[in-house]
Amino acid sequence: MARIGDGGDLLKCSFCGKSQKQVKKLIAGPGVYICDECIDLCNEIIEEELAETSEVRWEELPKPREIYEFLEGYVVGQEPAKKALSVAVYNHYKRVQAGENGGGAGREDAIELAKSNILLLGPTGSGKTLLAQTLARMLNVPFAIADATALTEAGYVGEDVENILLKLIQAADYDVKKAETGIIYIDEIDKVARKSENPSITRDVSGEGVQQALLKILEGTTASVPPQGGRKHPHQEFIQIDTTNVLFIVGGAFSGLEKIIESRAGAKGIGFGATIRSKLEIQASDQFQEVMPEDLVKFGMIPEFIGRLPVLTSVHNLDREALLQILIEPRNALVKQYQRLFELDGVELDFEREALEAIADQAILRQTGARGLRAIMEEVLQSVMYEVPSRKDVARVVITPDVVRNNVNPTLVPREPRTIGKNDGGRHEKSA
């Protein structure tokens, strides 16, 4: 087998047949041997296969209209934001594909396509995170969410900005090539606004310092990421990741920005013939629809940071009708989710229309938007979710408006009496 000669003292590789004298190293296994050359060849084959599978490729990149229609299935309302995101995401990945295919590289007149990161403004619970998650799901690219409030400038207590990239690498199962075409959503970016419009003399490590630290990775750079997260130290190995093709979607509530927009817009409404808009008219429209980069600078974002987020779009507060749609219309609507949970116990769950309206009203009162709907549903259904799995006599649960408004018990509809057929002598008996 692997031994040559009568003495049995000369061994050979079980794969290529070379003797131990012809190779540098021969490694023994249970009844087999492999040489260093075959190991190198195996590594090369595996690396080539991984390189082929790690690149995110589409047979055909979805067009903006197709992206918009996919978002429609999961996100209610917010049409302007969905259109802006559809176009921005399409252009971004078209640029990525052009780069992979050469894209005119080497030509003197070659045009370098710049990256278009996105700034998404809007109140909490209006669908910012869901929009980003749904985009990543459609495109089948790695996706990571980061909270800007946890970040600090390098060298201070808190998370380095490179830890955001580590989350993306982890989402890609440590496949760096795949991570380099992913999407990162940074939430609560308004919380790292500097304290005043003018540059700070003292060190603002969790505000302006974070914005400064994010500039390079937003624009596109090769970053060194510690594999285990945490702080960098000189004796550890780093993962190198190029952020040139990573799409950054940055979101925040920007509470108070509407006053800055209003004061700027109000200043233009002075003089004869000027268009005067009441506060009600401004509130009726999207409060961030008229935002300008200078408004964001006044809010506390540094100009360099805003410059790296060229696509500005916003989502608005959800009204009662939109919240009702969220409860029942999307593919993964909350009502459908809870109906499925009850169905697994063999029980139907029904909501009266007025009960759903009462749930929407509660979310508006709490000012939690769509995010608060699940919490309200949990409160409404908690007692019945505790009781029903232990009972075999309940066929249907009906949620009435009083259940939501006055905390009364839901209506439990018993199962129909079970009939025993002719073969059993025509007897009838009721289920327990």
Swiss-Prot record:
Pfam families noted in UniProt: AAA_2 (PF07724), ClpB_D2-small (PF10431), zf-C4_ClpX (PF06689)
Disulfide cross-links: none
Residues given in the record as ATP binding sites: P123, T124, G125, S126, G127, K128, T129, L130
GO biological process: cell division; proteolysis involved in protein catabolic process
CDD domains: RecA-like_ClpX
GO CC annotation, single: HslUV protease complex
Keywords recorded for this protein, A-Z: ATP-binding, Chaperone, Metal-binding, Nucleotide-binding, Zinc
Annotated residues for binding of Zn(2+): C13, C16, C35, C38
GO MF annotation terms: ATP binding; ATP hydrolysis activity; ATP-dependent protein folding chaperone; protein dimerization activity; unfolded protein binding; zinc ion binding
Basic and acidic residues: compositionally biased ranges: 415-432
Domain called ClpX-type ZB: residue spans: 1-54
InterPro entries: AAA+_ATPase (IPR003593), ATP-dep_Clp_protease_ClpX (IPR050052), ATPase_AAA_core (IPR003959), Clp_ATPase_C (IPR019489), Clp_protease_ATP-bd_su_ClpX (IPR004487), ClpX_bact (IPR046425), P-loop_NTPase (IPR027417), Znf_CppX_C4 (IPR010603)
Gene3D superfamilies: 1.10.8.60, ClpX chaperone, C4-type zinc finger domain, P-loop containing nucleotide triphosphate hydrolases
Annotated segments matching region Disordered: 411-432
Subunit structure as annotated in this protein's UniProt entry: Component of the ClpX-ClpP complex. Forms a hexameric ring that, in the presence of ATP, binds to fourteen ClpP subunits assembled into a disk-like structure with a central cavity, resembling the structure of eukaryotic proteasomes.
Function recorded in the entry: ATP-dependent specificity component of the Clp protease. It directs the protease to specific substrates. Can perform chaperone functions in the absence of ClpP.
NCBIfam families for this protein: clpX, PRK05342.1
Family: Belongs to the ClpX chaperone family.
Record-given protein name: ATP-dependent Clp protease ATP-binding subunit ClpX
